[in-house]
């Protein structure tokens, strides 16, 4: 599981600037769940081989008792509860304040790992302004400049150091055993717990023992018709004796971590509410993570024909970027349409791990170019020479040639469609990378 870092501090100390600095490698804000998370923004960051989730919070006043400030305090407390480590951001130029003392007292009581970041510290590394923050009793103050990126890398190293991050081999071990890691993702009250409880209650679904490989989250190993699965918790799974039961408990962090840990994600929508912004955010994160995906529309029995037509159009437009995903209409409560989900989940998993031989890929590429060559861009016409597979889960096809930086997105989609058809790739993203050969005459021409 990715570790979670929460950025905490009073208003206007530079938390959002630091958040954007930490997450810029993954397009800053990944999920801003309007209404649900209010002043908590969730993003992905990466440093070296380590990836992490960052939570950006609103200004924190632990003792706020009214209006928006109370809500901001509640949201920040929730972010701290979700986090593995807290980065307490203070304003070095603004100096120590009573609010800083209040926040420090709150964090000390929690006993959670905490790193003190002195922001806006450009040119002040040895300044007496830093010394006063030792009064907070949280150890050394680490000077950073979020705006200029100074000290940010070492700050992340300090934050991640006490977490004893798990090695990546855990995922590889599960893959070798042909265990499909499955996550059911969706916003609150779409029926995740109902669907999971229906699955866990099936006679054909037999639990088996497998050592837990994820930190903090609950996962349930089971077997169905000879295929082993590992259900990753996104719905508040709780053990009752020897039985697992799901309760509808939404956690953004748990959802993002489950998606990252899964081989296949079942995206659950609510037919009675259509495709919401939250649905689109979750769907976008699934695509960004490169996970195989199956879409299921729950409560299908609760809408009339007109509502169904409207919903289908909404899915086509708002989730057009997942058009490769199998689409199912179900009623978890009435157990309607649930059976066919399993074949789509297995098909998506197999597609994500499909091996594509280089000779076949190159032949398909040449046939595609012969049928429709890429358009010229000014003086340059892209020339494609050969293709090979660059990865699996998701599958990646690398195309080599000349002037490939001028290949249009429309032509890439044209190629994608032909590759998908040949290899029967259903339910998985397909990434196409263009690699232009270096021109040995360029330097001579420019000299």
Curated annotation (Swiss-Prot):
Give a yes or no for keyword Nuclease in this entry: no
Q: Which InterPro entries match?
A: G_ENGA (IPR031166), GTP-bd (IPR006073), GTPase_Der (IPR016484), KH_dom-like (IPR032859), KH_dom-like_a/b (IPR015946), P-loop_NTPase (IPR027417), Small_GTP-bd (IPR005225)
- MF terms per GO, please? GTP binding; ribosome binding
Q: Which UniProt keywords apply?
A: GTP-binding, Nucleotide-binding, Repeat, Ribosome biogenesis
Q: Which Gene3D superfamilies does this entry report, sorted A to Z?
A: 3.30.300.20, P-loop containing nucleotide triphosphate hydrolases
Taxonomically, which superkingdom?
Bacteria
* Pfam families the record matches: KH_dom-like, MMR_HSR1
Is Transmembrane one of the keywords UniProt gives this record?
A: no
* BP-aspect Gene Ontology terms: ribosome biogenesis
Q: Where is the KH-like domain?
A: 354-438
Record: residues binding GTP 2: 186-193, 233-237, 298-301
Q: Which residues bind GTP 1?
A: 9-16, 56-60, 119-122
Task: Name the protein family.
Answer: Belongs to the TRAFAC class TrmE-Era-EngA-EngB-Septin-like GTPase superfamily. EngA (Der) GTPase family.
> What HAMAP family would the database entry show?
GTPase_Der
Q: How does it assemble?
A: Associates with the 50S ribosomal subunit.
- The name under which this protein is listed is GTPase Der
Instruction: List the source organism.
Output: Acidovorax ebreus (strain TPSY)
